[in-house]
C-alpha cells in the first residue's frame, strides 16, 4: 500500500472500530487501522484477526495495521474515529496537528461530552475548527454481526452533502450493509447517546423480573424521552423513528450482546455498580452517558423521568426496584404530554 492511497483511516482498534475497518476492507478498499497500544496492534498484525473481540473473522488483505499515528493519518484524507465518548475530545486534539490539510472526519462514537453533556459535533468543532467537514454514523450495529457480514443498516449524517455521498459509497454493500443518508446531523448523534441509558433501564427491568410488558413499555417511553430531548435541540422527530433512534434503541434494549443491557440486568439482580462494571470487563458507555444526558436535559429544561431514575441508581445508590416503583407511581398523564 502506498502511504497516501488508503480510502479510510480508522482510529480505534476495539471491537467496533475493527468491525468497521473489516467492513470497509471487505468492500475492496485499502483501510488503515490505528490503535493507541503498539503491542495490541502488533498482535493484530501477527494474528491477522482481533482475537480478543472478533476471533473468528480474519482480516482482509486490504486492512493494514499501523501503530504510528502520523503514518496512519497521512494515509487518507478521511478519518473514522471509533473511541469511547469520554476520550473523544482528547483523541481529536491528539490527531489535529497530524491530519492532512484536506482531511474530513466521521465518527461512530455514541455519546456526549463527559461532564458537560455537549454534542460531539461541538467537541469536534472546538478541537478541529469550523472548516473541516464532519459526519456521524449511528444505528443498530453489534460489532460481531457486522464483522461477520450479517445484514446490518445504519444512518449517516454529514455537514457536507458530498462527504455524505462519498461515505455512503465507501461503506454501503448491497449484500450486507445498508447505509441511509439522513440530513439531521443533531438527531443522528443524539439517538446513540440516549439509547445507551434506556438500555440500562431495560436490563434493570428484566433483571428484576418484570417481564416483556414492562420492558416494552420502558423502551417506548424511552423513545419519548429521546424525541423530547431531540426536539429541544432542534432535531427532526422523524429521525428517532429510524436506524439511529428506534432501531438502535430496540437492538440495545433487547439483545444480550449489549453491554449496557447486561450491566442493567446485573443491577436489577442486586449487584452493585462497580461489581457489575468489573464483570462486564469492557466500557459500558451508558454509565457515563446517563450523567451526560441528564446534564443536557437539565440545561434544556427537558423532563426525562426514566433517565433520572437510572441516574439515581448509578450515582446515588438507589435500588433498581425502588427506581422502577418510583416510575410506576408517577401521576396519571396524557400519553402525549410533555412531561
From Swiss-Prot:
Catalytic activity reported: sn-glycerol 3-phosphate + NAD(+) = dihydroxyacetone phosphate + NADH + H(+); sn-glycerol 3-phosphate + NADP(+) = dihydroxyacetone phosphate + NADPH + H(+)
Matches recorded under Gene3D superfamilies: N-(1-d-carboxylethyl)-l-norvaline Dehydrogenase, domain 2 (1.10.1040.10), NAD(P)-binding Rossmann-like Domain (3.40.50.720)
Cellular component aspect of the GO annotation: cytosol
Amino acids binding NADPH: 15-16, 36, 110, 143, 259, 283, 285
Compartment(s) where it occurs, according to its Swiss-Prot or TrEMBL record: Cytoplasm
UniProt pathway annotation: Membrane lipid metabolism; glycerophospholipid metabolism
UniProt entry keywords in alphabetical sequence: Cytoplasm, Lipid biosynthesis, Lipid metabolism, NAD, NADP, Nucleotide-binding, Oxidoreductase, Phospholipid biosynthesis, Phospholipid metabolism
Catalytic residues of the enzyme: 195
GO process annotations (BP): carbohydrate metabolic process; glycerol-3-phosphate biosynthetic process; glycerol-3-phosphate catabolic process; glycerophospholipid biosynthetic process
Record-level Gene Ontology MF annotations: glycerol-3-phosphate dehydrogenase [NAD(P)+] activity; NAD binding
Enzyme Commission number(s) from the entry: 1.1.1.94
Pfam families linked to this entry: NAD_Gly3P_dh_C, NAD_Gly3P_dh_N
Binding site for sn-glycerol 3-phosphate: 110, 139, 141, 195, 248, 258-260
Function statement: Catalyzes the reduction of the glycolytic intermediate dihydroxyacetone phosphate (DHAP) to sn-glycerol 3-phosphate (G3P), the key precursor for phospholipid synthesis.
Similarity comment text for this entry: Belongs to the NAD-dependent glycerol-3-phosphate dehydrogenase family.
HAMAP family on file: NAD_Glyc3P_dehydrog (MF_00394)
Protein name: Glycerol-3-phosphate dehydrogenase [NAD(P)+]
Organism: Klebsiella pneumoniae subsp. pneumoniae (strain ATCC 700721 / MGH 78578)
Lineage of source species: Bacteria, Pseudomonadati, Pseudomonadota, Gammaproteobacteria, Enterobacterales
This protein's encoding gene: gpsA
